[in-house]
């Protein structure tokens, strides 16, 4: 995705690794930053150097759907999906992981999809890009169960693959 957009002169692509916090059992959090896992050719922008108000990005792509709901790790609240959504015309969520295709008849696997599907990043995003048609159907079904039958069309429209 980065290569596709960064070579197109119509786009200005900014890659901003977010600092994150490991949550301790006592409720405190330890600050951490991971900039070493990016290829050298990717120009990184520090979140301290970036202003959403000045940049007014057309699109923001996120990979972390959890916001404050992850029990072990979080980012600063200013980077939660609901806050990013107000700074862009289109918030796009692309899961950072690939999963096996899930058979809805496998109740254990289906049950645990709630841990990554019904999360704020998918809910607040204007567009969700799933890995396949089957995973899109899974997202639509799970989110419709969570929010009610009247929401099904919304999920069908905003989730793609």
Model-derived regions: residue spans:
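Active-site and donor-binding regions of nucleotide-sugar-utilizing enzymes
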Residues: 1-157, 161
């Amino acid at each position: 995705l980065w290569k596709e957009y960064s070579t197109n002169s119509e786009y200005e692509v900014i890659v901003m690794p977010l600092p994150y916090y490991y949550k301790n059992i006592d409720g405190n959090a330890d600050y951490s930053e991971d900039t070493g896992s990016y290829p050298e050719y990717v120009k990184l922008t520090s979140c301290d150097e970036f202003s959403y108000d000045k940049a007014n990005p057309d699109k923001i792509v996120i990979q972390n759907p959890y916001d404050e709901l992850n029990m072990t790790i979080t980012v600063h609240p200013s980077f939660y999906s609901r806050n990013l959504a107000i700074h862009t015309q289109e918030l796009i969520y692309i899961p950072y992981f690939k999963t096996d295709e899930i058979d809805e008849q496998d109740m254990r696997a289906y049950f645990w999809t709630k841990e990554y599907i019904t999360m704020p990043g998918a809910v607040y995003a204007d567009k969700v890009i799933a890995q396949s048609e089957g995973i899109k159907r899974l997202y639509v079904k799970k989110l419709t169960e969570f929010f009610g039958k009247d929401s099904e069309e919304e999920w069908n429209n905003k989730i793609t693959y």
